[in-house]
């Protein structure tokens, strides 16, 4: 099993419920164990699309036997099951799931970058990672 940190975010619909539903779907996968979830933080949207609702964000510490691409496929499947429609980059979404850190892996492919390249630009992600690291 590999220690992984997942970013979760939502700014459409019942944001809290969307995040908890995504966590429930993660827990239903026998190859994923959700260890801990950070405090939910309300944040301004990032990126060029400014006229959209506030986000609710969290970071989850998980362990998985899935390799990075398999985990990414599971996250995309959960987003799809929860009704996410990808219309515009940086636009509003009912759920967003990102692999932030996957063990000590470094991957730089068009569809997967680990560690997530925006960690340093997202204080809410840094706060969630610090919170979870403090509990270990």
Named regions from a protein language model:
Residues 1-32, 37-44:
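N-terminal beta1-alpha1 ligand-phosphate binding loop
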Residues 14, 31, 46-55, 66-136:
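Flexible, gly/pro- and Lys/Arg-enriched active-site loops
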Residues 9, 63-65:
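Solvent-exposed residues in well-ordered beta-strands and their adjoining turns
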């Amino acid at each position: 099993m590999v220690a992984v940190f997942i970013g979760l975010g939502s700014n459409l619909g019942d944001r809290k419920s969307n995040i908890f539903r995504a966590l429930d779907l993660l827990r239903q996968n026998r190859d994923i164990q959700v260890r801990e979830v950070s405090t939910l933080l309300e944040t301004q949207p990032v990126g060029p699309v400014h006229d959209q609702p506030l986000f609710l964000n969290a970071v989850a510490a998980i362990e998985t036997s899935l390799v990075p691409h398999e985990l990414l496929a599971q996250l995309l499947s959960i987003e799809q099951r929860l009704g996410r429609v990808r219309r515009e980059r940086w636009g509003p979404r009912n759920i967003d799931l990102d692999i932030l850190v996957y063990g000590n892996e470094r991957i730089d492919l068009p569809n997967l970058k680990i560690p997530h390249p925006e960690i340093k630009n997202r204080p809410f992600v840094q706060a969630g990672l610090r919170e979870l690291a403090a509990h270990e």
